[in-house]
From Swiss-Prot:
Cofactor: [4Fe-4S] cluster
Species name: Prochlorococcus marinus (strain MIT 9303)
InterPro entries to which the protein is assigned, alphabetical: NifH/chlL_CS (IPR030655), NifH/frxC (IPR000392), P-loop_NTPase (IPR027417), Protochlorophyllide_ATP-bd (IPR005971)
Gene Ontology process terms (BP): light-independent chlorophyll biosynthetic process; photosynthesis, dark reaction
Subunit structure: Homodimer. Protochlorophyllide reductase is composed of three subunits; ChlL, ChlN and ChlB.
NCBIfam families: DPOR_bchL
Protein name: Light-independent protochlorophyllide reductase iron-sulfur ATP-binding protein
Length: 296
């Protein structure tokens, strides 16, 4: 006897964490999920982009979705407690919490939340992200927000860490001009396309980071239908801003590369505000990427 198991559809061949209506962000706010290969600079990019939106007069909330909870420290100038840690302190009775227990104000008024995550090898990071959004809604903290940025762990595209895609309008992918970063980006494109079948999320574009050139990125973009939205070269001031625990907007603009980076972040934020045209990109097969990238 053969038993056929049917799985809830959420893109072809995928089983994903489903978010109920109570944890979805209301229409009106611009919601961006930032993905990319681990260590590529997503937190740096997210924090500086949040700062740029705030400079343009927007009310911004950044949600770090990594158990390392290091997404927002350049905005807050410290490591803030995570939502999961705070909930554990009150035995998960969220009604006992006040907003300032888990949400912290950073540079130029940016609101910062670190969702945290379960111990390594246990639990589901997507569930934690969903509970974070639910908590924010319970305390009416999303009602006066113009922009929400999810800074997502590594290039994990399982059901759990794909959860932010269920809230987002756009996904931005951070990459470098190298094989490994672009290979990871290709997998992320596939995950976003799967989510886009049932959710509003669409590809917003590529952020080239720590890259002097764009030749390999542009090769990939041409084949898949992606587009580079911003380009940040390997500017030492960005590295030093992390060590100083501050955003690029708090660095001396007379230093080499600082003003250029600030302007590029402001330009990227303005592009997103002006309603980016969603991209219809198609991922390549692994062998196709292998054959595509490299020098002739």
């Amino acid at each position: 006897m053969t038993t056929t198991l049917t799985r809830p559809a959420d893109g072809e061949g995928s089983v994903q964490v489903q978010q109920d209506a109570s944890v979805r962000i209301q229409e009106g706010a611009l919601v961006i999920a930032v993905y990319g290969k681990g260590g590529i600079g997503k937190s740096t990019t997210s924090s500086n982009l949040s700062a740029a939106f705030s400079k343009l007069g927007k009310r911004v909330l950044q949600i770090g979705c990594d158990p390392k909870h290091d997404s927002t420290f350049t905005l807050t100038h410290r490591m803030v407690p995570t939502v999961i840690d705070i909930l554990e302190e009150v035995d998960f009775h969220s009604e006992e919490l006040r907003p300032d227990d888990f949400m912290f104000e950073g540079f130029n008024g940016v609101k910062c939340v670190e969702s945290g995550g379960p111990p390594a090898g246990t639990g589901c990071g997507g569930y934690v992200t969903g509970q974070t959004v639910k908590l924010l809604k319970e305390h009416h903290l999303l009602e006066d927000t113009d922009v929400v940025i999810f800074d997502v762990l590594g290039d994990v595209v399982c059901g759990g860490f794909a959860a932010p895609l269920q809230h987002a309008n756009y996904c931005l992918i951070v990459t470098a001009n190298d094989f490994d970063s672009i290979f990871a980006m290709n997998r992320i494109v596939a995950a976003i396309n799967a989510k886009a079948k049932n959710y509003k999320v669409r590809l917003g574009g590529v952020i080239a980071n720590r890259s002097a050139d764009l030749d390999q990125i542009e090769k990939f973009n041409k084949e898949t239908g992606l587009k580079t939205m911003a380009h940040f070269k390997n500017v030492d001031a960005i590295r030093r801003s992390r060590l100083k625990k501050c955003t690029i907007f708090e660095m001396d603009s007379s230093e080499e590369g600082v003003l250029e980076c600030q302007n590029e972040y402001l330009a990227l934020a303005q592009k997103m505000i002006d309603k980016v045209e969603p991209l219809e990109a198609e991922p390549l097969k692994d062998r196709e990427i292998f054959d595509l990238l490299g020098f002739d």
